[in-house]
Structure formats: C-alpha cells, structure tokens
Amino acid sequence: MGQKINPIGLRLGINRTWDSRWFAGKNEYGKLLHEDVKIREILHKELKQAAVARIVIERPHKKCRVTIHSARPGVVIGKKGADIDKLRKKVADITSSDVVINIVEIRKPELDATLVAESIAQQLERRVAFRRAMKRAVQSAMRLGAEGIRINCSGRLGGAEIARMEWYREGRVPLHTLRADIDYGVATAFTTFGTCGVKVWIFKGEILEHDPMAQDKRMAEGDGGGSSRPRRDAA
C-alpha cells in the first residue's frame, strides 16, 4: 500500500499536518474549501517564476492568513512590496475578509520534492536529456543531506515513439515506514511530443516523536530545506 498511496496523505496526523488549517460548520465548509482551491490556483498562476513549493492557508477569526513557501521570496514580494500587495488584494476579493500574506524562504530547494520535480519538468521542456536532468537532481539532493531520493519520469521520453517510464534511486526511500519524513512532489512537462510526468520522493530521515507538526518544526530549524522566518507581513 505504501508503494501506491501518496506519501504525504499517508502520514497526515503522524508527522505531517494539513496545508489548510481551519474549522468550519456544515454550511460553511464547502464555500471555504472552494475558496482555498481558488486561492491556490491564482497564486500558482501569478507566481510561476517564484519557485513556490507550498501554500498554507489558515483562517483565524474573520481573517485569512496565507503562508507562501518559496525559494525566491524576492520575486514574490516585488519592488518595494508592490507585487505582494496586488496578491493580497486578489486573495481578499475571493475571501471577502482581511488577508495576511507571509513569505517563508526555502533555503535548500534541492531538498524540496515539489521544486525538484518542477525543475526536471522545465528541463524536459527545454529538451535537456532526461537522464542527465534526473542524475543531476539525485546528486544535488544527496550532496545536501538527503538520506534517499527516487525520481520517476514517464511519457515519450526523448521523443520516443512508445511511451515508457524511467526511474533513478539512490539511498533509502522507505515508503511503508510511517515515521519516515518523506517529501513527495509531482510536475508535468509539456513537450512537443506530448506530456511527460515527473514524480519525486525525498527521504530526509526519521521522526521518532508522534507530532503532526514535526515536519514544519524541522523546516523551521532549517533541517528540511526551509526557514520559517517571514520575509514580509502584508497585513
């Protein structure tokens, strides 16, 4: 089962927590969930070049707090904070409430599965050899402290007539071990031959304590490729 299921979903409530953190009654739940989907769609569309790995949405009383995890916070903020103010207004139009946007810098993008997958997809679109792109990503992750990494690429790789899947793995990636801190990311490369899918699993070590916030705490300490210091509060 661990081989098939999304590793993040399998570990929710054990050593991972949800990206949407709020409670709503029966009548409000659908509306707020739809707002979350819209917010993420708009932010990913507006911040294509900002290397956004994760968007966390929290809803304290009559407010909406959005935390953007990005490897390029300067692109998100813009000149003198102009871009982040525009984003705050767009999110406020969706939620009809006060919006606070925080930026969290990812110090080691090579250890973030989503950013690694997007990087490989972009290289495939630029016609870089898929084996070279995969090997380079594996070497970078292992050099920066990952205990294991696995990368799958599928589709008409290299313009082949028949679609196939190629994968590389180095180190350990224990998908069945619930205490394992495994990051997972997916991206799609739109090439002239069709679409190619990229999947990345990165094993960063084991979390022995039962703590849903453990992964966030490790990112805050800089151990998981992130830093929780907000670069700007747009409230």
From Swiss-Prot:
GO terms for molecular function: mRNA binding; rRNA binding; structural constituent of ribosome. GO terms for biological process: translation. InterPro entries: KH_dom, KH_dom-like_a/b, KH_dom_type_2, KH_sf_prok-type, Ribosomal_S3_C_sf, Ribosomal_uS3_bac-typ, Ribosomal_uS3_C, Ribosomal_uS3_CS. It comes from the Bacteria. Residues 215-235 are annotated as: Disordered. Keywords: Ribonucleoprotein, Ribosomal protein, RNA-binding, rRNA-binding. Part of the 30S ribosomal subunit. Forms a tight complex with proteins S10 and S14. Binds the lower part of the 30S subunit head. Binds mRNA in the 70S ribosome, positioning it for translation. This is Small ribosomal subunit protein uS3. It comes from Rhodopseudomonas palustris (strain ATCC BAA-98 / CGA009).
